[in-house]
A protein has these predicted regions:
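Conserved beta-strand-loop-beta-strand hairpin that lines the nucleotide-binding pocket
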Residues: 1-17, 62-161
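STAS-typified acidic loop motif
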Residues: 17-29
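Short coil/turn residues that cap or connect secondary-structure elements
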Residues: 22, 38, 42-45, 62, ...
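Conserved short strand/loop->alpha-helix "switch" segment adjacent to the catalytic nucleotide/phosphoryl-transfer site
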Residues: 28-55
Length: 161
């Protein structure tokens, strides 16, 4: 299971932040915004997974949060990936439920768990509601980091005086 509690660094600033009431078509607009950021960051390898996970979190807001109001944050991870957070004032914590194969809903967090590297739910710092978040890490970014680290360790070092 990918469910982990891991807050971003306190000093991390989101690249994108929106605060508004969600409608039936809000997920489509947020997916488009997310994809634009991922394209600019050269992280398109995580776009499909991140968009699906975002859609599921927004669907939960539309379905379960009174007033459908939430805040959405997008963070670029230094490790080469993206973190998306959806915060709302509803105290009810979503649960991952494996339903009957004929059920029409209830699989959102199962999908989030399947397509993300990490996800979790944590109480909001102000005590009102919760934040549901996920992280998708780029395989390409990880490979590039590994090559850079191996290049650094293989590089000749100047003798110390």
């Amino acid at each position: 299971m990918n469910h982990v509690i891991a807050s971003p660094p306190v000093d991390a600033e989101p690249t994108y932040h929106a605060d508004f009431a969600m409608g039936e078509h809000s997920a489509r607009h947020l997916r488009r915004i997310l994809r634009l950021y991922l394209k600019g960051w050269e992280l398109l390898d995580v776009a499909d997974a991140a968009e699906l996970a975002l859609t599921e979190l927004i669907a939960n807001v539309v379905r379960y949060v009174p007033g459908r109001r939430c805040q959405t944050f997008i963070f670029l991870l230094a490790a080469g990936g993206v973190r998306v957070e959806v915060a709302d004032a509803c105290p009810d914590v979503p649960r991952m439920v494996v339903g009957d194969e004929l059920d029409e809903g209830g699989r959102g967090l199962v999908l989030v768990d399947a397509v993300t590297d990490k996800w979790g739910v944590e109480p909001r710092p102000d005590g009102r509601g919760k934040t549901v978040w996920f992280e998708c890490l780029s395989v390409a970014g990880a490979a590039d980091r590994a090559i850079a680290l191996s290049d650094r360790s293989a590089a000749p070092r100047a003798p110390r005086p």
